[in-house]
Regions:
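Hydrophobic alpha-helical segments and helix pairs
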Residues: 1-34
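Surface segments flanking catalytic/ligand-binding clefts of nucleic-acid enzymes
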Residues: 30-161
Length: 161
């Protein structure tokens, strides 16, 4: 059986896929503990692969989260991925109290009811929530970005005095 080492596959991915997709693949490898960041840092990546390495995070729980992280980097605000808030992980905490949640296909039925209960608890405690889904992130990003920018423009990310 012929098998290429993961490091070689990641290098090829970096050179063959657009940046967002390459970062999502690398993030997934880190998240699944198929490789660790110190090992990646020691490898002689160059060109676009070194750019991908500079953008990876082991905290991305899905490819959607990788895309969103890269798309929000320009904001220059404190953005905490996979933050713990009131005993639950949220996809992103922007500033002090704006929460961005990204729903995948698993957010239906019982999961949706649990999500709604947690959203209610977050709102009671003064957090603002933006919840978006796969289709919005992948096919209508400008509308998602506009929601986030409007919320920030209204100061919804800032701690209330």
């Amino acid at each position: 059986m012929l098998e290429d080492p993961l490091e070689n596959v990641l290098n090829v991915v970096a050179h063959c896929l657009p940046m967002e997709q390459a970062v999502a693949v690398w993030d997934s490898a880190l998240n699944k503990n198929l490789i660790d960041y110190p090992r990646l840092q020691r490898l002689p990546f160059n060109g676009v692969a070194s750019q991908v390495l500079a953008n990876v995070s082991r905290f991305a729980d899905s490819g959607l989260e990788s895309f969103v992280r890269l798309r929000l980097a320009w904001l220059k605000l404190r953005i905490v991925p996979q933050a713990w808030v009131l005993g639950h992980r949220v996809d992103y905490l922007i500033g002090d109290r704006l929460i961005l949640l990204i729903d995948g296909s698993q957010h239906e039925g019982k999961q949706r009811r649990l999500d709604n209960a947690h959203d209610f608890e977050l709102r009671q405690r003064g957090y603002e929530i933006i919840r978006v889904g796969y289709v919005e992130v992948m096919f209508d990003w400008p509308a998602v970005q506009l929601k986030i920018m409007q919320a920030i423009g209204l100061g919804m990310h800032l701690k209330k005095r």
